[in-house]
From Swiss-Prot:
Catalytic activity: N-(5-phospho-beta-D-ribosyl)anthranilate + diphosphate = 5-phospho-alpha-D-ribose 1-diphosphate + anthranilate
Cofactor binding description: Binds 2 magnesium ions per monomer.
Protein name, entry field: Anthranilate phosphoribosyltransferase
Highest classification ranks of the organism: Bacteria, Bacillati, Bacillota, Bacilli, Lactobacillales
Any one Gene Ontology cellular component term annotated for this protein: cytosol
Assembly and binders: Homodimer.
Positions annotated to bind Mg(2+) 2: D224, E225
Length: 335
């Protein structure tokens, strides 16, 4: 640990193997909270590298509980969190739209770290069981084409990181790693990050981890979602190549809304917002959801443009299919 910490503090990147070995030491309970915290802060101050992200992701992925699903072509739209926008649960709401549109959604998430309501919090408020065993989760996914995978339940190794992260109260490499370690192997991914400086790097990490197609997005003001206001930047992984792009709401046929109009609250309030969106109630919440679901359809390769993805998202919601997908999950991910 000392050598690795000194290396990072000197501004030098760890190799993938060095990070993998250090992560395994943490996972095996060999380091104290103070050592883990000092390491996370040092990495943040230096700036995380692709090799460090990949090494940590591979170690945590290997330690995760496997989900024995029969479905292929799985996708996730989990974000890094940590943007402190206090928005409603955008990616969680969009996941129902994506699943209703035919995308096999393995929604990976956690409780709130820096916001009022994480994806796990809002889904628990909707009656979703966070603690089903892996075999049952696989059955839910195979039947519904959507499942919520509670990170704390499926990543036993996280118990060594979570107390430290809560005490630090700042985004760390763990925020960046969380979306990379879905227990179900992913073919495609929409990943929101609050770090626009890491768009290209993260897309290349996803490439190294085997994603066939992926889109990494940062919204206006560093939101880890696409925003229907201001400028969005994204990196697209397509055909093995990473390209950088940007767009505004008007570029994809949408009107702008204000950040204040998409702020959420605690889990009960956010669960009502989610249901209202899936019921097609006109609002800034709905507009933000169709934008992010549209981006997800594009990331998945189901449509050939973001604008076409937005149109598909509106259609899925208007037909009631997204609300029905919520009801399906509520009926299956229980007990």
């Amino acid at each position: 640990m000392k050598n690795e910490l000194e290396k990072v503090m000197a501004g030098r990147d760890m190799t993938e193997n060095e990070m993998n070995m250090l992560a395994n030491s943490i996972i095996q309970g060999e380091l104290s909270d103070v050592q883990i915290a000092s390491f996370l802060v040092a990495l943040k101050m230096k700036g995380e590298s692709a090799s460090e992200l990949t090494g940590l992701a591979r170690a945590l992925q290997k330690a995760a509980i496997s989900i024995p699903t029969n479905l292929t072509n799985a996708m996730d739209n989990c974000g890094t969190g940590g943007d402190r926008s206090f928005s409603f649960n955008i990616s969680t709401t969009a996941a129902f739209v994506l699943a209703a549109g035919g995308v096999n959604m393995a929604k990976h998430g956690n409780r709130s770290i820096t916001s009022k309501s994480g994806s796990a919090d809002v889904l628990e408020a909707l009656g979703i069981n966070l603690y089903l065993p892996a075999e049952k989760l696989a059955q839910v996914f195979d039947k519904v084409g959507l499942v919520f995978l509670f990170a704390q339940n499926l990543h036993p190794a996280m118990k060594y990181f979570t107390p430290v992260r809560r005490q630090l109260e700042i985004p760390t490499i763990m925020n960046l790693t969380g979306p990379l370690i879905n227990p179900i192997p992913l073919d495609t991914q929409l990943l929101g990050t609050s770090r626009p400086d890491l768009l290209e790097l993260t897309a290349n990490v996803l490439k190294g981890l085997g994603r066939k197609r992926a889109l990494v997005i940062t919204g206006e003001g560093g939101m880890d979602e696409a925003t229907p206001f201001g400028l969005n930047h994204y990196a697209l992984l397509e055909n093995g190549e990473v390209t950088l792009h940007k767009f505004r709401a008007a570029d994809v046929g949408m009107s702008e809304v204000a950040l204040n109009d998409i702020r959420g609250g605690e889990a009960p309030e956010n669960s009502e917002i989610l249901k209202n969106v899936l019921e097609n109630c006109s609002s800034a919440f709905l507009e933000t959801t169709v934008l992010n679901a549209g981006l997800g359809f594009y990331a998945n390769g189901k449509v050939d443009s973001i604008k076409s993805g937005i149109e598909l998202a509106r259609e899925v919601i208007a037909q009631g299919a997204a609300l029905e997908k919520l009801h399906e999950l509520q009926a299956e991910q229980i007990g």
